[in-house]
């Protein structure tokens, strides 16, 4: 079990935690608007909640794509969100120099999938002492996540969450291996596993300069993943996904957040009400 703050704990056997928000900080107003709706819905449904957003999308496909406001402005917005709503925050870091200042503001640091094997960044994240969400690289098998976990533990941090965001299936497509969740649980000492349903819906136009997506399938994919029995769901929503500056094709429309989460909570409650059944 990983303690995110004084009231939220993350465990595969506990009620799921929602790591939800927007893809990238487009503006302070959008961050506050989105967080307000997440807080309203999660409080109504009784779902533990962590706000997520990126201050810099450092791995965009095109050099001309919007990346975000940068670290300094991003941290200011995060502080405003915390002051207004009192929620914990998760965000990703891409550079070693970002780890210390970001750790002063946010509650959970995130290691991006494309950078998950970068040892110096792993060590810098570990040294903050904060919980770290490790995104499973699309090119890595579930069992190989144990090597990244070992790096963190050797660097002195065992406050780890593992996140599946899909696996490469041929060119320009992602799939989610439902058996992989169990493999990660067994090979990584039952660390909390969360499912990034938004990014698992990405696909690509080979000639395109940005990722496409399949948001019309978010409900069935989220149900399938959470039916395994996971510690959390990682989700991005937007008031107008078609106008989002990043990953709009995969984002849940914000006005569908309540009915969507009501279904996910009902499923999570049902799955975790079953007695544990081990088959050798």
UniProtKB/Swiss-Prot annotation:
This is 2-dehydro-3-deoxyphosphooctonate aldolase 2. Pathway: Carbohydrate biosynthesis; 3-deoxy-D-manno-octulosonate biosynthesis; 3-deoxy-D-manno-octulosonate from D-ribulose 5-phosphate: step 2/3; Bacterial outer membrane biogenesis; lipopolysaccharide biosynthesis. It is found in: Cytoplasm. Belongs to the KdsA family. GO terms for biological process: keto-3-deoxy-D-manno-octulosonic acid biosynthetic process. One of its GO terms (cellular component) is cytoplasm. The lineage of its organism: Bacteria, Pseudomonadati, Pseudomonadota, Gammaproteobacteria, Pseudomonadales. GO terms for molecular function: 3-deoxy-8-phosphooctulonate synthase activity. It is an enzyme of class 2 (transferase). The gene is kdsA2. Keywords: Cytoplasm, Lipopolysaccharide biosynthesis, Transferase. It comes from Pseudomonas putida (strain ATCC 47054 / DSM 6125 / CFBP 8728 / NCIMB 11950 / KT2440). Its EC number is 2.5.1.55.
């Amino acid at each position: 079990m990983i303690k995110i703050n004084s009231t939220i704990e993350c465990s595969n056997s506990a009620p799921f935690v929602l790591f939800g928000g927007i893809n990238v900080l487009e503006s302070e107003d959008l961050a506050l608007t989105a967080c307000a709706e997440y807080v309203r819905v999660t409080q109504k449904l009784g779902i533990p909640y962590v706000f997520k957003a990126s201050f810099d999308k450092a791995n965009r496909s095109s050099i001309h794509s919007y990346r975000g406001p940068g670290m300094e402005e991003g941290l200011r917005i995060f502080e405003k969100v915390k002051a207004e709503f009192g929620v914990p925050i998760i965000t990703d870091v891409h550079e070693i120099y970002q780890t210390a200042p970001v750790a002063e503001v946010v509650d959970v640091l995130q290691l991006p999938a494309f950078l998950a094997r970068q040892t110096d960044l792993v060590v810098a994240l570990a040294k903050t002492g904060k919980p770290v969400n490790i995104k499973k690289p699309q090119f890595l098998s579930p069992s190989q996540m144990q090597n990244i976990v070992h790096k963190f533990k050797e660097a002195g941090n065992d406050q780890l969450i593992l996140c599946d965001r899909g696996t490469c299936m041929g060119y320009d497509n992602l799939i989610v291996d439902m058996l992989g969740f169990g493999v990660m649980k067994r090979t990584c000492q039952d660390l909390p596993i969360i499912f990034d349903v938004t990014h698992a819906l990405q696909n690509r136009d080979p000639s395109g300069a940005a990722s496409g997506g399949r948001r019309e399938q978010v409900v069935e994919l989220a149900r399938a993943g959470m039916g395994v029995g996971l510690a959390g769901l990682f989700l991005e929503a937007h008031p107008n996904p078609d106008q989002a500056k990043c990953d709009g094709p995969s984002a849940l429309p914000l006005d569908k957040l309540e009915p969507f989460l009501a279904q996910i909570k009902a499923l999570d409650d049902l799955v975790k009400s079953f007695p544990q059944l081990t088959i050798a």
